[in-house]
């Protein structure tokens, strides 16, 4: 599902990050957060009046040593690229500035819905001053206090009203996948190589609400959708080298994918940013295939591939379920194997196991390794049932959920993996007290 997206834009020091955090804090229920990205997060999901949407804080995107106005321009253009609705933030203390007018000019040309809000209206007596902001050309400005959260409900009501209507008429049962990884691991080359190897149905497919482009193709008797290839192709090096922007694009692609191809550069090995992006794919419960690209550039002996695989398993211990493939976008080495791997992982993501079969495996596991005792109290597991797919999720009914230690939960997951093919997908176990 493609979430409608709100981007917050405005010159520095108008309170974009405060409003961003307020919006994320206003959600009715906690939607999937962004693991691994905390203090410097620029992307999240929220909910207002039952409507889920994504939020981007363009102010969090550091564009380096660019001049002041150039940074504002680039941040506004990022918002235009990414958003369905733009929240244009000014502040009552500074009034209408030249920088505000510059942002307004860029947004006006974009022809995207804009909601104008004036922040820092902490004193009700200042509300009359917001009428100066009509001059920016976006209709009625909404008074807002980020510090106290006053006025945010009215702003979010306006945002929801401006989101495009959902088109539910198109059924799409293709397998959706994306390529993620830090800058310069060869994602763009892999995209082109994969599409070059397979029959593209329509290229490009324009997104319904923004100019991101997905690409459909056929292989191994299946239809695939490669998510957001425009994000890799269009902006290219301009923003690819801005780490936060690259991570944000990866998070958004992951949210829309069934299976994620996590790309590592064989020449450069594993970096910290690799771990951040991979961690989110894992936490989001997506199917994962680890793709080691540029394998043609590595000097090899009989142990090279095994050594690299061992390094991956050591650095990404939580991805022990993810298959690894060594490829070259340049020489097309092993690329023909990728579609079948994606299909297999997608099938494993949706695999359902009958409760009777599950409980046979559970009883065998408990016989081999009895449940632990904590402070003199033994964990008792009565039965297990599967409650969800994508990822496969199982509930175990027990005497006391607090007694199910992480290590025994991991043992049960390993037993499930030995009994059934869950390669490429995380498995979630939830402990519940038997009533």
Curated annotation (Swiss-Prot):
Gene3D superfamilies, A to Z: 3.30.300.20, P-loop containing nucleotide triphosphate hydrolases (3.40.50.300)
KH-like domain residues: 351-435
InterPro entries: G_ENGA, GTP-bd, GTPase_Der, KH_dom-like, KH_dom-like_a/b, P-loop_NTPase, Small_GTP-bd
Residues where GTP 2 binds: 181-188, 228-232, 293-296
Keywords on record: GTP-binding, Nucleotide-binding, Repeat, Ribosome biogenesis
Residues annotated to bind GTP 1: 10-17, 57-61, 119-122
Keyword Nucleotide-binding: yes
GO molecular function: GTP binding; ribosome binding
GO biological process, one term: ribosome biogenesis
Domain EngA-type G: 4-167, 175-350
Subunit structure: Associates with the 50S ribosomal subunit.
Record-stated family: Belongs to the TRAFAC class TrmE-Era-EngA-EngB-Septin-like GTPase superfamily. EngA (Der) GTPase family.
Functional note: GTPase that plays an essential role in the late steps of ribosome biogenesis.
NCBIfam families the record matches: GTPase_EngA, small_GTP
Descriptive protein name: GTPase Der
Source organism (scientific name): Lacticaseibacillus casei (strain BL23)
Gene name of the encoded protein: der
């Amino acid at each position: 599902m493609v979430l409608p997206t709100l981007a917050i834009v405005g010159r520095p020091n108008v309170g974009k990050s405060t409003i961003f955090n307020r919006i994320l804090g206003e959600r009715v229920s906690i939607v999937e957060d962004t693991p691994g990205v905390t203090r410097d997060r620029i992307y999240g999901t929220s909910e207002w009046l039952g409507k889920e949407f994504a939020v981007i804080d363009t102010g969090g995107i550091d564009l380096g040593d660019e001049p002041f106005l150039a940074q504002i321009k680039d941040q506004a253009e990022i918002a235009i690229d990414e958003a369905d609705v733009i929240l244009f933030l000014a502040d009552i203390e500074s009034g209408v500035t030249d920088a505000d007018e510059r942002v307004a000019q860029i947004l006006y040309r974009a022809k995207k819905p804009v909601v104008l809000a004036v922040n820092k209206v902490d004193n009700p007596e200042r509300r009359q001053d917001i009428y100066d902001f009509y001059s920016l050309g976006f209709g009625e400005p909404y008074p807002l206090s980020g510090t106290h959260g006053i006025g945010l409900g009215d702003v979010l009501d306006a945002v929801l009203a401006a989101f495009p209507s959902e088109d539910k008429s198109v059924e799409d049962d293709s397998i959706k996948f994306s390529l993620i990884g830090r800058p310069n691991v060869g994602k763009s080359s892999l995209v082109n190589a994969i599409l070059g190897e397979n029959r593209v149905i329509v290229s490009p497919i324009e997104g319904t609400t923004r100019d991101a482009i997905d690409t459909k193709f056929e292989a191994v008797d299946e239809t695939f959708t490669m998510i957001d290839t425009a994000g890799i192709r269009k902006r290219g090096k301009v923003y690819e080298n801005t780490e936060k922007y690259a991570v944000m694009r990866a998070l958004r692609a992951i949210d829309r994918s069934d299976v994620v191809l996590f790309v590592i550069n064989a020449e450069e090995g594993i970096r910290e940013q690799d771990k951040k992006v991979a961690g989110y794919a894992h936490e989001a419960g997506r199917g994962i295939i680890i793709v080691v690209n540029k394998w043609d550039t590595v000097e090899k002996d009989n142990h090279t591939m095994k050594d690299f695989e061992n390094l991956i398993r050591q650095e990404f211990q939580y991805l022990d379920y993810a298959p690894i493939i060594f490829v070259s976008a340049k020489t097309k080495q092993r690329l023909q194997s990728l579609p079948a791997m994606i299909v297999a992982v997608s099938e494993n993501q949706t695999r359902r196991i009958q409760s009777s079969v599950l409980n046979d495996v559970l009883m065998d596991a408990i016989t081999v390794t009895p449940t632990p005792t904590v402070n003199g109290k033994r964990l008792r597991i009565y039965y297990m049932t599967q409650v969800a797919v994508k990822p496969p999720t199982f509930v175990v009914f027990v005497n006391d959920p607090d007694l199910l230690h992480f290590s025994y939960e991991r043992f049960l997951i390993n037993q499930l993996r030995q009994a059934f093919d869950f390669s490429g997908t995380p498995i979630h176990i939830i402990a519940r007290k038997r009533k």
